[in-house]
């Protein structure tokens, strides 16, 4: 798989870009703040419908514009597929697939399968559980695009159930039988969609685990062994059954957990049970990595998660596109060599770097330079050969 064309309109610092790409390696070189990362961010957005840098779409639209457009043409086994995404300010985003409008932007998921390595990856080890949940959900969706609808359904039910809990919080409405009956309905919906999402995550973690272990051994052969596991809000007592990923069991366990925590949820006005409170646990030896891993160990573990994702996607179908955003500058020589070895085998690798010295020695790659130019509409990014 490779991206043949990338087009941008009013995306971040890019007022306009039309870039023809090829299989193999392409390096975008430019000073920090010149817009090179925005190119990879646009491709990652086309792959996942999300940014790796911000949680909302508004910052993706260039200042003064009311929408941004990201267009890609992806080639997979000789077949071309065009995706156009319109990111709008204050209204729903739109998408086209092979120039035809689609009802939901989610319909383009799976066209571009990519793996992104970025400085922000350190948050996979050191950050909040939400970072690790997003890693799992993005990867699960790339492999099975239908998971996106499950995530959307779960998030919608979670918002509505939380709003009801807030309206019932404290002692004011405890006797409102109608409201409590409505809460029972939301419990059932939350358990239904939550079980589907948890089952997908658990299946993914079980497949990732041996790949993470192998990748970490490659990156840090003298370190402790790395391992991962799924930690559920259902509690340690249920962990063995939970890790089997049986959907019926998970749905029943979620319903039981919601019932057991109902008084606490009503008191606090928030949902205390469900996959939105779960975590991907990362271990080095017998210690949880977060809070105990050194800087080098944390980087190795973060890279291992991305390398494991690459291997799973490659085993599914065809090589995913590798996006390497300024990561070589963050790595020591051993980790550079390990990542470069993976990149050697990928069909397409797109890399950003501040200076040429950040690129592995001996790499044969097309080089494009990113510059900033002052215009009447502000500073915009441009490419030159």
Curated annotation (Swiss-Prot):
Main localization, broad class: cytoplasm
One function term, GO molecular function aspect: ATP binding
Subcellular location per the Swiss-Prot or TrEMBL entry: Cytoplasm
GO CC annotation: cytoplasm
Residues annotated to bind ATP: 30-37
PROSITE patterns with a match to the protein in the record: RECF_1, RECF_2
Pfam families found in the cross-reference section: SMC_N (PF02463)
Keyword hit for Oxidoreductase: no
GO terms of biological process kind: DNA replication; DNA synthesis involved in DNA repair; double-strand break repair; SOS response
Keywords carried by this UniProt record: ATP-binding, Cytoplasm, DNA damage, DNA repair, DNA replication, DNA-binding, Nucleotide-binding, SOS response
InterPro entries xref list: DNA-binding_RecF, DNA-binding_RecF_CS, P-loop_NTPase, RecF/RecN/SMC_N, RecF_2
NCBIfam families registered for this protein in UniProt: recf (TIGR00611)
HAMAP family: RecF
Family membership noted in the UniProt record: Belongs to the RecF family.
Function (record text): The RecF protein is involved in DNA metabolism; it is required for DNA replication and normal SOS inducibility. RecF binds preferentially to single-stranded, linear DNA. It also seems to bind ATP.
PANTHER family per the UniProt record, alphabetical: DNA REPLICATION AND REPAIR PROTEIN RECF (PTHR32182:SF0)
Name listed for the protein in its UniProt record: DNA replication and repair protein RecF
Source organism of the structure: Mycolicibacterium paratuberculosis (strain ATCC BAA-968 / K-10) (Mycobacterium paratuberculosis)
């Amino acid at each position: 798989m490779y991206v043949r064309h990338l087009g941008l309109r009013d995306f971040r610092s890019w007022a306009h870009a039309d870039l023809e790409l090829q299989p193999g390696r392409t390096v975008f070189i430019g000073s920090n703040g010149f817009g090179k990362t925005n190119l990879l961010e646009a491709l990652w957005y086309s792959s996942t419908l999300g940014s790796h840098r911000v949680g909302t779409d508004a910052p993706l639209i260039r200042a003064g514009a009311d929408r941004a457009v990201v267009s890609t043409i992806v080639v997979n086994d000789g077949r071309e597929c065009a995706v156009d995404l319109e990111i709008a300010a204050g209204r729903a985003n739109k998408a086209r697939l092979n120039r035809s409008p689609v009802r939901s932007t989610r319909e383009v998921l799976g066209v571009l399968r990519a793996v992104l390595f970025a400085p922000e990856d350190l948050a996979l080890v050191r950050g909040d559980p939400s970072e690790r949940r997003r890693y799992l959900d993005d990867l699960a969706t790339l492999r099975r695009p239908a998971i996106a609808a499950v995530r959307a359904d779960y998030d919608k039910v979670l918002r509505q159930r939380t709003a009801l809990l807030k309206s019932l919080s404290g002692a004011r409405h405890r006797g409102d039988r109608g409201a409590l009956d409505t809460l029972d309905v939301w419990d059932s919906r939350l358990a239904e969609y939550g079980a589907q999402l948890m089952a997908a995550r658990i299946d993914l973690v079980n497949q990732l685990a041996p790949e993470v272990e192998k990748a970490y051994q490659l990156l840090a052969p003298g370190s402790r062994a790395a391992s991962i596991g799924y930690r559920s809000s259902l509690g340690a007592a249920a962990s063995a059954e939970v890790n089997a990923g049986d959907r019926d069991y998970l749905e029943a366990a979620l319903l039981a957990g919601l019932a057991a925590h109902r008084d606490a949820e009503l008191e606090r006005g928030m949902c205390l049970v469900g996959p939105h409170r779960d975590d991907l646990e990362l271990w080095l030896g017998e210690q949880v990595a977060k809070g105990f891993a050194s800087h080098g160990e944390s980087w190795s573990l973060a890279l291992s998660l991305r390398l494991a994702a690459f291997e799973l996607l490659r085993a599914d179908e065809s090589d995913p596109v590798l996006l390497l955003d300024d990561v070589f500058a963050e790595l020591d020589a051993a980790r550079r060599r390990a990542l470069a070895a993976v990149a050697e085998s990928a069909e397409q690798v797109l890399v950003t770097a501040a200076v040429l010295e950040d690129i592995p020695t001996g790499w044969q790659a097309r080089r494009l330079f990113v510059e900033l130019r002052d215009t009447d509409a502000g500073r915009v990014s441009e490419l030159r050969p």
